[in-house]
From Swiss-Prot:
There is a cross-link at residue 24 (Glycyl lysine isopeptide (Lys-Gly) (interchain with G-Cter in SUMO2)). There is a cross-link at residue 135 (Glycyl lysine isopeptide (Lys-Gly) (interchain with G-Cter in ubiquitin)). Transmembrane segments: none annotated. DNA- and RNA-binding protein involved in various processes, such as translational repression, RNA stabilization, mRNA splicing, DNA repair and transcription regulation. Predominantly acts as a RNA-binding protein: binds preferentially to the 5'-[CU]CUGCG-3' RNA motif and specifically recognizes mRNA transcripts modified by C5-methylcytosine (m5C). Promotes mRNA stabilization: acts by binding to m5C-containing mRNAs and recruiting the mRNA stability maintainer ELAVL1, thereby preventing mRNA decay. Component of the CRD-mediated complex that promotes MYC mRNA stability. This is Y-box-binding protein 1. One of its GO terms (molecular function) is mRNA binding. The record marks 217-218 as: Cleavage. The modification N-acetylserine is found at residue 2. SUPFAM superfamilies: Nucleic acid-binding proteins. The modification Phosphotyrosine is found at residue 160. Residues 142-152, 239-248, 277-289 have a biased composition (Basic residues).
Amino acid sequence: MSSEAETQQPPAAPAAALSAADTKPGSTGSGAGSGGPGGLTSAAPAGGDKKVIATKVLGTVKWFNVRNGYGFINRNDTKEDVFVHQTAIKKNNPRKYLRSVGDGETVEFDVVEGEKGAEAANVTGPGGVPVQGSKYAADRNHYRRYPRRRGPPRNYQQNYQNSESGEKNEGSESAPEGQAQQRRPYRRRRFPPYYMRRPYARRPQYSNPPVQGEVMEGADNQGAGEQGRPVRQNMYRGYRPRFRRGPPRQRQPREDGNEEDKENQGDETQGQQPPQRRYRRNFNYRRRRPENPKPQDGKETKAADPPAENSSAPEAEQGGAE
């Protein structure tokens, strides 16, 4: 008889566990009676222990605690409160991360007899649709929003890079290559370093190209090669004091040349050239600050040569008149 008693004791242990689980509705083990993740299907075999009182009953959720995972539903027909556990929810909202039922939501469920009273099972929305879920439950779409938010800034980076690459490289083929090379570091380093680079990248790109274009019109290739060097230095060093020092040095030889021109030229040439000289002074003073004086000296000599020719021309005319 002792051996038979030993064999009968193990089945008694799970029964005690089930009864203990039902006495603690706040614990997750309370869902063992109504079914765990696989308990939804185990509700039918558990029908031997729990009787099905009613099926497809409509009710309004009285309250539901998402953290603890249980609440109560008020039946519409008998106005009776029915206990509901999160494991009893059969069709959850696919957008919700946890199983839950919203407060005041109308649901359809089966009423099962539990040890402490009526319990809900197979909870769905009216007509078998998924339940809406509690507003306090975590939303799965919250994790999908990040790539969508990152989309517009990336497009903005590409457009900004297209404008920069178009200014640097005149060819249309070189632009996409520059984009492919520039996209990778921005993805790794993300946004803060990108915004920090903006002021440093804009100044040389938008300020230097017009200066180079003006120099190429009047200067030789050697002068253009020398002009590229101070442009790089200006990016790293403070170049405003250099610009202020430059103009007074450039004015001295021009004034001397102007005095020589005034002595050699006649009244007609003097009346024509002063506006030209003023225009040249203003032009060089404003836009050609970062340039070296070497190419400008070449321009000054070129500018000084034609007046010398003009001065010789009136002398020849005067000699012919005599």
